[in-house]
Amino acid sequence: MPLHHLMIGTWTPPGAIFTVEFDDENLTLKLVKRTEIPHDEPISWMSFDHAKKNIYGAAMKKWSSFAVRSPTDIVHEASHPMNHDPKASSPDTNTRAIFLLAAKQPPYAVYANPFYSHAGFGSVFSVSDTGKLETNIQNYPYQPNTGIHGMVFDPTETYLYSADLTANKLWTHRKLPSGEVELLGSVDAPDPGDHPRWVAMHPTGQYLYALMEAGNRLCEYVIDPATHMPVYTHHSFPLIPPGIPARDRETGKGLYRADVVALTSSGKYMFASSRANRFDLQGYVAAFKLRDCGSIERQICLNPTPTSGGHSNAVSPCDWSDEWMAITDDQEGWLEMYRWKDEFLHRVARVRIPEPGFGMNAIWYD
């Protein structure tokens, strides 16, 4: 089929879900639907359920749920407050719903992370028979200064790995039959200045990849088969060009921050991105070749992106082929499509959607 649909959310109000059509023969992108959702619940990170019948959203002060009947028929069904801490839902705090992960195996629970202040807990939601977010069944503790920004399951969905950006560590939990989780342990990031933001896992379950936001690097971990804890291999790869000025001369603040890491559908390649903190600078996207066991064989490229990426620059490989990868930015509001062919990355299409806060992560519907 030459036509594919992607859904994208926004960082700021008004809330909306944008459906974009990609034609892989004519190499075009076009906006086909803007679905209005609750005004104050823009979705900065969205995820499909296992069947792509529901979208779950990290929506400012809420966790939201939408039935997906077709690419252009998306219906809001539920919004749940952040109940892990009484202060989190207050309009006077900066606590924000930042990430969620939908289980692919029964009981299909959804795992949600707040960020900024009062973010020391993760939340687990059960779902209805149709996949709607239903009940907050667990609020499990990390630590008071935690700020989880990304999580991933191992292939068996027995172990959950969390990237704690603010506490600078990786956490490991075991999933119970109920969908709730219990703590196994945590490991500090290799460097005090790393701040892990995102994690991805190889299909073998043997290797974990941690993207370090402040460290602007990708660190490789092997999973200890006895403890299921990640062990740093001392292999890391740059997500901004080595030697580039990385800090503002006047303020000392970082000029770049790494964003997202994701594997291609075959598990043979992996993409990772970084953003710039000034609009006059560019972000970067890297590609890696993975060995069959999951270790990183080599870094293939580190290409500049057209803009800084803003809050985004999120890479989103399609889930049926290694050929297509989408990147979103919210500096200018672009969705761009890249082709990965013969280990070269080139842009084949782009569409600009000049709406407030567009665009956050893109998810592939078909």
Regions found by a protein language model. Give the residues of each.
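Short coil/turn segments that connect the beta-strands within blades of beta-propeller domains
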Residues: 2-4, 51-53, 105-108, 156-158, ...
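Short loop/turn segments immediately following beta-strands, especially the blade-tip
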Residues: 19-28, 65-74, 124-133, 173-180, ...
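Surface loop/turn motifs at the tips and blade-to-blade linkers of beta-strand repeat domains
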Residues: 35-40, 80-84, 89-92, 139-145, ...
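Conserved beta-strand position repeated across blades of beta-propeller domains
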Residues: 47, 101, 152, 200, ...
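Asp-box/WD-like beta-propeller blade repeats and closely related beta-sheet repeat scaffolds
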Residues: 73-154
